[in-house]
Each structure stands twice: as structure tokens, then as C-alpha cells.
Amino acid sequence: MAVSMADITKLRKMTGAGMMDCKNALTEAEGDFDKAMEIIRKKGQAVAAKRSDREASEGCVLAKTTGDFAVIIALKCETDFVAQNADFVKLTQDILDLAVANKCKTLDEVKALPMGNGTVQDAVTDRSGITGEKMELDGYMTVEGASTVVYNHMNRNGLCTIVAFNKAVEEGLAKQIAMQIAAMNPIAAVSYTHLRAHETG
């Protein structure tokens, strides 16, 4: 059957798949969008399975807080090109938003969250099939405190910090502390008095 450009474009917006993949899926599904989406999903799963033994050493790392609950998450891929892709970064952000909203404590909980027409894990697998690269959620940590602050360095997708305080802290000061930690990468924080006492013996 003939497939219109409007339908192809619509399916592409729904799935993120390439134009030709969308056209072929719609043709095979005889114009049924649900069936076409399932065809694209299965193709993505097959592509992801073939790449399961590859190394995913690049990716996107982002952090977010609700005030007393903060999360940092990493979605990994194979190349920096994909890591910098807007759709890949958006997927990471969307997963992070879901994890924070549901206050997930483990990565398994995150992967099982509903997302789109499936789960978070399904969405990652689908994106893997679209890009042709191995992708995996590989890092996840939560921090809780009376007050937490996060810092995403220049909104880039690699350098983030989370700082938790045992009482309310002025937001500007908290951000400055988080930025200094990102810049200096300290192994610990001690008071000036303690440091001077250690230096003088």
C-alpha cells in the first residue's frame, strides 16, 4: 500500500526512527500505527542484542534534586557523537525526571518505570536500535538530606555534583559549594580549624 509522507513523519516523531525505517514499518503494517511501532521496537531490540558485547564508554550524566531527595544517573553509549545528540540527552533527562518524581532507590526500579508505550528499559533499547550503538543505564545514586543541591557543569552531560546538608542552607551558598567540589574534586571536607591543627601538629 502507498504510505503518505505525513504518516511517515508522524511515525518518526513518535519513535525517533529513520524515515526509511518508518516507511517500511508502515508499509508492512498496512498503515496501522500501533503495528508499525511494534515492528520498529522489535527491530531495535534485535539491533541492541547484536551490540550487547560492545563497550559503552561514553554517555550522559545528569543530576536533579527535589530539595530533600537528589539523584544522579548515567546513560552510556559507544561514541561521543551520540552522547552529544540532543535526543540522547533528552532521553537521559526524561529518565532522570521520572526517577526523581518516583523517588526510585535502585536502578532496577528506574528501568521498570512506565515510559511511552513500554518501560524505561524499552525506551533505552529502542534508542539503541535507532542509533545503532549499544546503550545502557549504568550508573545511579540517590542522596537524601534536610537540604540537597546539585550542580550540572554548564549543563554539559558529564560533570555533576550532589551535596547534602543536615539543615537548610542558603541556595546561593549551596550552589557555590557544589561548584567548588566539581572544580577541585576534593576527597573530603574538613574545617579550617581542624586543618590548621593538623598542619601544626
Description of each model-found segment:
Residues A2-R196:
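N-terminal assembly/interaction segments in proteins that build large macromolecular machines
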Residues A197-G201:
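A short, hydrophobic C-terminal helix/tail in secreted or cell-surface proteins
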